[in-house]
Amino acid sequence: MNKKNLTICSFCGRSEKDVEKLIAGPSVYICDYCIKLCSGILDKKPSSTISSAPVSETPSQPSDLRVLTPKEIKKHIDEYVIGQERAKKTIAVAVYNHYKRIRALLHNKQVSYGKSNVLLLGPTGSGKTLIAKTLAKILDVPFTIADATTLTEAGYVGEDVENIVLRLLQAADYDVARAERGIIYIDEIDKIGRTTANVSITRDVSGEGVQQALLKIVEGTTANVPPKGGRKHPNQEYIRVNTENILFIVGGAFVNLDKIIAKRLGKTTIGFSDDQADLSQKTRDHLLAKVETEDLIAFGMIPEFVGRFNCIVNCEELSLDELVAILTEPTNAIVKQYMELFAEENVKLVFKKEALYAIAKKAKQAKTGARALGMILENLLRDLMFEIPSDPTVEAIHIQEDTIAENKAPIIIRRTPEAIA
């Protein structure tokens, strides 16, 4: 539709059909919704942050930015993320430097160092996404997750990269100032490497176009964001968001990257030959810890894109002990959650140590890391959660090793009739 057929608000993009009143000015329109919003902003104290500013040519300057030290950041991450000590330390330093840089800019200091964007390597379920989520929670900044495989360059069927910024803006309740210091996590970034196979013919087959499109917002630009998402069109109004101070974290499994690194280092150096298809996980982790930008370029990432990530770190595959720790130790550990659910029914849920290791072994066999733990427990406890609310005789449930390994029924301890009465 064109303007002759559909008149829209110049500020929020709502059409005349979506509002009660649309007031016309010289070449502009404003709806009753935006008038009320502006009125509310004017009623606030002058020091208040304007939460819906439509334009931001330069990064906004929130004054309440507190920078945690690397040790403080890691300590908070430790409450939720098990293992990955090297990755957590590296990311804590990168995040500290990133927000220290923003704070320096806010105080009009000359800053010579650039953004500390982070590239996380590691297998599925190793904690890449959880680290990014936890960072956002610690820092109290807006956060959003995007899937790189859904993104396309302009002119192809799919999602524009600006829609990632839109989702961050939505997470910030359209507060541009908060969005401009938020965190964006882009998963499956390895799937847009130029050598990646099995992509749809409707997308940029090489993946290079998507990397080029992402490059602009990652390095810092003023993105024109459609308020309602979707594709851009000439008559549309935009919210302008400066991405210079947004922290970008990208992650991917980068399957076979270890072999590219091995080739660079030399086969005799690491003690295996090309015909050994399956390397031990310890060997893979050792190789990925030695990753260089040239390895990522050989994998299929373009040099300009890789160059915007000065922090590249590997998340190692989780061990059995670490998977068991994930079940029980974090603040929001999944076993603690289920124990609380059963406690609300006045039932004590007990996991034997051997049962926890059996669950961890099952998760390791699934090759999806920590992600498999929740599914295993849900399948294990679903029938019990169905029956327990209707059975007041149950006092405790003990999950044994054979409950997991051999699908045997858990031990159920029942109350005496006197206790029920």
Swiss-Prot record:
UniProt keyword annotations, A-Z: ATP-binding, Chaperone, Metal-binding, Nucleotide-binding, Zinc
UniProt-annotated binding residues for Zn(2+): C9, C12, C31, C34
Superkingdom per UniProt: Bacteria
Any Pfam family the entry gives: ClpB_D2-small
Keyword Zinc: yes
Positions contributing to ATP binding: P123, T124, G125, S126, G127, K128, T129, L130
Domain ClpX-type ZB: 1-50
The keyword tRNA-binding appears for this protein: no
Assembly and oligomerization: Component of the ClpX-ClpP complex. Forms a hexameric ring that, in the presence of ATP, binds to fourteen ClpP subunits assembled into a disk-like structure with a central cavity, resembling the structure of eukaryotic proteasomes.
Homology family: Belongs to the ClpX chaperone family.
Entry function: ATP-dependent specificity component of the Clp protease. It directs the protease to specific substrates. Can perform chaperone functions in the absence of ClpP.
Name under which the protein is recorded: ATP-dependent Clp protease ATP-binding subunit ClpX
Species per Swiss-Prot/TrEMBL record: Chlamydia pneumoniae
